[in-house]
Amino acid sequence: MKPLLAIAILILPAPMLFAQAGPRVSTLPFESVPSPLKYSIDQNLGEVLSVAVNSRGHIIVLNHPGTATAGPVYGNATTQIFEFDADGKYVRELGRGVYGLAYAHSVRFDKYDNLWVVDKAAMSVIKFDPAGYVLMNLGRRDEGPDEPHYRKADPPPTPVDGLFNGSTDVAWDKDDNIYVGDGYFNSRIAKFDKHGNWIKQWGGPGTGGVHANENPGHIRNPHNIGIDRDSNVYVADRGNRRIQVFDVDGNFKKFIFLNVPYDKMRHPVFGNLPVDRPDETAPWTICITNTTPQYLFTTDAEPGRLYKLQLPEGKILGTWGESGHELGELNWAHGIACPSEDLLYIADMNNWRVQKLVTKGKK
């Protein structure tokens, strides 16, 4: 099927109608602030996978340094969690020596300023209080296996209630129930109550077809998740190049596609120029603002853009950026924090930095 203007729209039964975007989208008026974080020379960042901001404006940076201890890097301690104040001044490091930290994938603050860290390799979700003490752990880290269990078996192992396999992200609904993106290999959403008790799961591995519009509810890596005030659960179904929207019980509501035209002949940062590049690109991140109305920000790896969507419709309002290495360019934007629609922090993974974006004229 050929796209209509900027966004592909398919006529489906009412619960499956696609969010629509206009025929053209504008460039978002963001500018990137040089050197937004202040730290010493011995704290150079490595791959930055995620960033979060609490109610005080303090910034948490999830860093993967080059100081892993003996053993396979992926299965050992290669995670640092740095805190900076609202002015970007270094405050402290959190989580040193915590058993469930190995190769952390995402950090999020809940509405109580508790910090949650989702670890892909340790297959754990860890809750820290504002002081930095561990309050809860979901999942369980393997006991130093000889063979790395994070590798996908063929066929993949059967998911187990309460355990994860390549966990990616966490979100909460208005009743404080916990939703975990699980993950690289289980490809499901796991739901717990606020005490950490298992409730249910939904999803499971499956493809979206050539145009990413088939098999609703099937997921290929729920890479990021978020929940709005209307209890819509947004899942960045990265492997299927789509955002899936569910209610809090896991009932599918609609797809949203990042189907804004781009230069398909522009060479990607990594790899050869693909022969058949799809119209829709793969969402990597999700951040929903605590504003009225709410907005959803997301990114893709190629062509390396940031997208702003209006909720709950999912209409794309604009894009910003492109892939590259310079300030204002992105090289695998792996996480977003969105304190407001005019202030964003982006975990610019392969550029080894955090970019701070502000709307021009609103510094």
How should these model regions be labeled?
Residues 1-4:
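Positively charged n-region of N-terminal signal peptides that target proteins for export
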Residues 6-16:
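Bacterial N-terminal signal peptides
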Residues 20-363:
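Eukaryotic scaffold repeat domains enriched in small/polar residues
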